[in-house]
Amino acid sequence: MKIYEGRLTAEGLKVGIIVSRFNEFITSKLLAGSIDCLKRHGAKEDNIEVCWVPGAFEIPVIAKKMASKGKYDAVICLGAVIRGATPHFDYVSSEVSKGVAHVSLDKEVPVIFGVLTTDTIEQAIERAGTKAGNKGYDAAMSAIEMSNLMKVLD
């Protein structure tokens, strides 16, 4: 039996990170977590590129643009969509998750979904580096593993 796994080293990887400016007090912490993870695993700062977008809904089109360039081993998508009193949350979170998945499949580049979709602001804060860890860090770990797995399978 042959088993394929991605190594957990970011040495030599080129990573694009897309960050939603909406809820920036949360997303900036997710970004810090992603960058921390990448650097701790050997990525050079010069190989990390960050692109800010207005909101989570704009993430998929920029993910497609970045994934299409052929220069990134992975694209990490970071945002925070917090439920409010209207159905807007459902529309945004659904379309962003579908859009990110489609880009990854279409471009055969790991496009990692690091967008928080929470019911409350407290839940978002917990997932941005307090009690529930930092989902930006977790997204970067997925990007590292998937990038290396894609290389193994090529």
Curated annotation (Swiss-Prot):
Catalytic reactions of this protein = (2S)-2-hydroxy-3-oxobutyl phosphate + 5-amino-6-(D-ribitylamino)uracil = 6,7-dimethyl-8-(1-D-ribityl)lumazine + phosphate + 2 H2O + H(+)
Q: Which residues form the active site?
A: 88
User: Which keywords label this protein?
Assistant: Riboflavin biosynthesis, Transferase
What's the domain of life for this entry?
Answer: Bacteria
User: Its GO CC terms?
Assistant: cytoplasm; cytosol; riboflavin synthase complex
Any Pfam family the entry gives: DMRL_synthase
According to the record, the signal peptide region is: none
What pathway does the UniProt record associate with this protein? Cofactor biosynthesis; riboflavin biosynthesis; riboflavin from 2-hydroxy-3-oxobutyl phosphate and 5-amino-6-(D-ribitylamino)uracil: step 1/2
Q: Name one GO biological process term.
A: riboflavin biosynthetic process
Q: Where does (2S)-2-hydroxy-3-oxobutyl phosphate bind?
A: 85-86, 127
Q: Which GO terms describe its molecular function?
A: 6,7-dimethyl-8-ribityllumazine synthase activity
Q: Where does 5-amino-6-(D-ribitylamino)uracil bind?
A: 22, 56-58, 80-82, 113
SUPFAM superfamilies named in the record = Lumazine synthase
Its EC number is: 2.5.1.78
Its annotated function is as follows: Catalyzes the formation of 6,7-dimethyl-8-ribityllumazine by condensation of 5-amino-6-(D-ribitylamino)uracil with 3,4-dihydroxy-2-butanone 4-phosphate. This is the penultimate step in the biosynthesis of riboflavin.
Entries under PANTHER family matching the protein: 6,7-DIMETHYL-8-RIBITYLLUMAZINE SYNTHASE, 6,7-DIMETHYL-8-RIBITYLLUMAZINE SYNTHASE DMRL SYNTHASE LUMAZINE SYNTHASE
The entry sums up its family as follows: Belongs to the DMRL synthase family.
Q: Please identify the protein, giving its name as recorded.
A: 6,7-dimethyl-8-ribityllumazine synthase
Organism name: Clostridium botulinum (strain Hall / ATCC 3502 / NCTC 13319 / Type A)
